[in-house]
Amino acid sequence: MDDADVRQEARGFIAKVDISNIREDLSPYVAAANATVKQEELGEGESGYTITRPNGKHIITVNSLETEERQRFTICHEIAHIVLDLESSHEEVPSWSYAKRHQNEIACDTFAAELLMPYKQWLSRVPKEEPSLELIQEMAQLFGTSFPAAASRFASLSDMPCAFVTMERGAVRYAARSTALRNVGAWISPRSTIPVGSVAHLIRSSGNNRTDTAEVPQDLWFDNWDRGLVLWELSRHYARTDTTISVLWFDSDELPEVEVNRFGKRIEDDCGLAELTGELPWPGRSKRR
């Protein structure tokens, strides 16, 4: 089950529920999943779990010591396990970490994000402007989610070329791309190191919690990309978990003109090298603000 399948399942589930007040009250989701929720003090790093009784009723337990936004996410994550009928595979990996996490857990995170930030509500409320620290914080507060969750949602549903990248211990773990970037085959390699020269690399090097925004070359982030183009990078580092996130974006007219195949991979020009003429070509276009 890939991301698209999970999102389709989540939206089908949402369509059967009254979500008019879902940003304040998750009980319609809980009822639709034939579940109840209880709070309990759990161990550090344990966000929650679900027990199913013989009568088919599900009991979702969440860690009362965690923040309200984290508890909301856990409820939706556990509902995902119920609706998708996926076994839990938490093992010893922290719930916030992508490293070595089972695909079931990542799928349930995707489902939970759909429930917390229903795409129709999101699109009707998100300002039609470029991302900023203030905008993402505003959306996170509006939907009762974390800053990284809101940043990822912004990138994946944006009309502009936009991406969201999660990095742990100096390596890329996950990247979400807007439709505009997927259509041109933009790719950020998982498990690659944080690129030197990026905002993410700069702020992680400080060793402190930090947020910053700056322009960087597009080809720092995207594989096999045209040089001479720039993008904006908004990055935040969480020192305690050594986690870094970045939102990358630029104007549509700064997209390179490329062809992609039916798998979304870029088609490289295979016509060979141009004949040498003895004349130097003009430099490629470079757009900076």
Question: Where in the sequence are the language-model features?
Answer:
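Active-site hotspot residues in diverse enzymes, especially metal/ion-binding acidic/histidine motifs
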Residues: 1-289
